[in-house]
């Protein structure tokens, strides 16, 4: 059986806080009773049977394990409220106690709530490809690992034979080709899989243009693997690292995610690195093209992308740049004497890779970047220490559930914990659930980043992070404005509670450090970006090289980052009015102006990191309310309430499709189904805006949906994905289905029933 390990290290691993927050899965062939194994097989079979109706796992393996380790007291039966019934406090508090008992039972011993953070169908396959190249596939992925990877890929194959960009999406060349290749590497034959799954996949790929039609990121990976030629890729010259910092296209001005993808890519491109051409690679060259490999027009293939993958078509000016670099710059840079510059550029690029590796304890900013850095380190030195350290941190990236083994972005431990704490505190049941809160408080304190990046971090295009909270855990090291703000909020809230209940409060100097990080990130327009100060011009987005993302090249401001920053600073000002008071007042004022400025004409806010208008609106409304705005004195809040009420479904809930993010137009979930997480976001917005003082009926109707949806064990059902990034890719947060219904019910009890 698979076992989730919490806060445990491993050979050669380094941690700044004794691995608090670390979560990784190990396979133990002797673990589990026959009954437990049968239970696991049952939920696997049920997922596979229903995989086309419900594409997200319910994260049941983790829940089953932790509930056995942390048994809770018997809970009362679930409450059901009829349409004609008035919602009573007893109904709400019973539902809350059932929810909190369940959610406390799946808290890890280090204080965080483990949970899946996955969904994209391009995180996993590069790990399989990279380890195949390096020869360590069977060392890192045992037969049990490989079995679960194969299970996952087949479970998320679409009915037409292809795979999507993410698990809810239509089939794309990117997802299909990478998945087919990964399955072949893992030993699947040409006709293997249920109902000829491999043959169907191959047919889909060939019918849609073959491997030449894979997008640019895919072209890179299949080239490194040996299935494609570097002459069919747009250039990634490492010499860009030598441009003067003032140049608008310098990599240091890129969004950190884009920059950290470019670093190892430019190194591998500059070396023209290609893995071993094995018999399998030779076979795949025949399987995945509609013409003989040696007859392919690679220059034409550079700009060939399947229409199913094309979300962001390249503007003409970008294609002209690629053409110049390909036909003019590269032939010059690869010949003497300019080849000496290439060698220096390669050293600079790999130097940046090593800096990122060392400062993130070989986790890297995300799994996409990690596997690129891993293969770059191996290309530099197959026997080097850096590559070995990368291997040791691979388990931090994968997650096992009833649908199989998948790769996560990097984990959302701190992000989920910050929300979970606020949700529990909203219930006013602290004395009943103080052990849960105390453990969570210790996790928050242990997760704050204690020091800035090493050395001359500004020369490495890094920003201060001392005092920040990351999205995942301290070892990750990457500051995020909203995570820092949520961490600041819960640290302050805990500091106002009795220490004998929740433990010793955090030192005020550490709160000051967090404030320093937040204030340092604000842009001139008042908004807050996510990771680093905005450094580049907006027109640079014209050179976004990906075909499937939008807003990926430069850092920009987001309402979901601005709102927590404003909210956190407002709470800090309440208790520490003398610390940087003038600057904080100015920052809050400018942040509020930004939030009001980016409101949509219909009263909503577009959410970049969650789906979509319900998500953005919840953040914006919360910040405005925290600064004294309400329905009566703020036109923006009145418009937001009108917007949300216009989207309420006949059953009282809200349900918004991921297509809202992609198409930038509100789209209901298919069948006009309600989603409990989005229903909770809408309710929190209406409660914050004080809609209840005008007409509480819509709030009562939404709360009824939450109460009636609770399951027998106190959990809430898994529904559609509610996370998203870069407009076009979904991300499942399995803890959201617990956190936000609890939070909405807690606020409802406290601010509507008791009002």
UniProtKB/Swiss-Prot annotation:
InterPro entries per the UniProt record, alphabetical: SQ_cyclase_C, SQ_cyclase_N, Squalene_cyclase, Terpene_synthase_CS, Terpenoid_cyclase/PrenylTrfase
Keywords: Isomerase, Repeat
Active-site residues, as the UniProt record annotates them: 482
Reactions it catalyzes: (S)-2,3-epoxysqualene = lupeol
Major enzyme class: isomerase
EC numbers on record: 5.4.99.41
Keyword Nuclease assigned: no
Gene Ontology MF: a single term: lupeol synthase activity
PFTB repeats: 146-187, 511-552, 588-628, 637-678
Gene Ontology process terms (BP): pentacyclic triterpenoid biosynthetic process
Family that this chain belongs to: Belongs to the terpene cyclase/mutase family.
Protein purpose: Oxidosqualene cyclase involved in the biosynthesis of lupeol.
Protein name: Lupeol synthase
Organism: Betula platyphylla (Asian white birch)
Species classification: Eukaryota, Viridiplantae, Streptophyta, Embryophyta, Tracheophyta
């Amino acid at each position: 059986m698979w076992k989730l390990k919490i806060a445990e290290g491993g050979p050669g691993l380094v941690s700044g806080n004794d691995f608090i927050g670390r979560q990784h899965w190990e396979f133990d062939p002797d673990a589990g009773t026959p009954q437990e194994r049968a239970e696991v097989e049952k939920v696997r079979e049920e997922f596979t049977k229903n995989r086309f109706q419900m594409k997200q796992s319910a994260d049941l393996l983790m829940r089953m394990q932790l509930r056995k380790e942390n048994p809770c007291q018997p809970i009362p039966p679930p409450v059901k409220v009829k349409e004609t019934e008035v919602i009573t406090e007893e109904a709400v508090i019973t539902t809350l106690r059932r929810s909190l008992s369940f959610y406390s039972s799946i808290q890890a011993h280090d204080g965080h709530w483990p949970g899946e953070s996955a969904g994209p169908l391009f995180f996993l396959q590069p790990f399989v490809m990279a380890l195949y190249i390096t020869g360590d596939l069977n060392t890192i992925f045992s037969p049990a690992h490989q079995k679960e990877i194969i299970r996952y890929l087949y479970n998320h194959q679409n009915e037409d034979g292809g795979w999507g960009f993410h698990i809810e999406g239509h089939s794309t060349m990117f997802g299909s080709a990478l998945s087919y290749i990964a399955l072949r590497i893992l030993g699947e034959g040409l006709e293997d899989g249920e109902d000829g799954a491999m043959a169907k996949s191959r047919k889909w790929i060939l019918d849609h243009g073959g491997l030449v039609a894979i997008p640019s990121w895919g072209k890179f990976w299949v080239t490194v693997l040996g299935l494609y030629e570097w002459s069919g890729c747009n250039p990634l010259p490492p010499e860009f690292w030598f441009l003067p910092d003032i140049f608008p296209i310098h990599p240091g001005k890129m969004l950190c995610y884009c920059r950290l993808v470019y670093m190892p890519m430019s190194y591998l491109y500059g070396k023209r690195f290609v893995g071993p051409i094995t018999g399998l690679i030779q076979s795949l060259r025949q399987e995945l093209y509609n013409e003989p490999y040696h007859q392919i027009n690679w220059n034409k293939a550079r700009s060939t992308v399947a229409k199913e993958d094309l979300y962001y078509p390249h503007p003409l000016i970008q294609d002209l740049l690629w053409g110049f670099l390909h036909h003019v710059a590269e032939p010059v840079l690869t010949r003497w004497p300019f080849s000496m510059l290439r060698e220096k550029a390669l050293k600079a690029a790999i130097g940046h890779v090593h800096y990122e590796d060392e400062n993130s304890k070989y986790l890297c900013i995300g799994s996409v970047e990690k596997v690129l850095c891993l293969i770059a380190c191996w290309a530099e030195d197959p026997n080097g220490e850096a590559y070995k350290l990368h291997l040791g941190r691979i388990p931090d990236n994968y997650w096992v559930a009833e649908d199989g083994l998948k790769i996560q972005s990097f984990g959302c431990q701190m992000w989920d914990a910050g929300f979970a704490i606020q949700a529990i505190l909203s219930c006013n049941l602290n004395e009943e659930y103080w052990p849960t809160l105390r453990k969570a408080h210790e996790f928050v304190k242990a997760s704050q980043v204690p020091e800035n990046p090493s050395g001359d971090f500004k020369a490495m295009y890094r920003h201060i992070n001392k005092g920040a909270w990351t999205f995942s855990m301290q070892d990750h090291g990457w500051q995020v404005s909203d995570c820092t703000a949520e961490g600041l909020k819960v640290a302050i809230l805990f500091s106002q509670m009795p220490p004998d209940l929740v433990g010793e409060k955090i030192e005020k100097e550490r709160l000051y450090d967090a404030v320093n990080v937040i204030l340092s990130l604000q842009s001139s327009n008042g908004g807050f970006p996510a990771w680093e100060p905005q450094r580049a011009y907006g027109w640079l987005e014209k050179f976004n090289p990906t075909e499937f993302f939008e807003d990926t090249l430069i850092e920009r401001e987001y309402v979901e980052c601005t709102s927590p920053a404003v909210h956190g600073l407002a709470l800090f000002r309440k208790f520490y009015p003398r610390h940087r008071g003038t600057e904080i007042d100015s920052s809050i004022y400018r942040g509020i102006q930004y939030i009001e400025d980016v409101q949509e004409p219909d009263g909503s806010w577009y959410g970049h990191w969650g789906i979509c208008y319900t998500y953005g609106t919840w953040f914006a409304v919360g910040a405005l309310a925290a600064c004294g705005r309400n329905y009566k004195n703020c036109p923006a809040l009145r418009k937001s309430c009108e917007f949300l009420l216009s989207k309420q479904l006949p059953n009282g809930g809200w349900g918004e499709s991921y297509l809202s993010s992609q198409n930038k137009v509100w789209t209901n979930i298919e069948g006009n189904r309600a989603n409990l997480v989005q229903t909770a976001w809408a309710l929190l917005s209406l409660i914050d805006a004080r809609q209840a003082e005008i007409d509480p009926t819509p709030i009562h109707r939404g709360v009824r949906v939450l109460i009636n949806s609770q399951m027998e064990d106190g959990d809430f059902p898994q529904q559609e994905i509610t996370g998203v990034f870069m407009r076009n890719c979904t991300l499942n947060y399995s803890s959201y289905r617990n956190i936000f219904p609890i939070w909405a019910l807690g606020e409802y009890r406290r601010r509507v029933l008791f009002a």
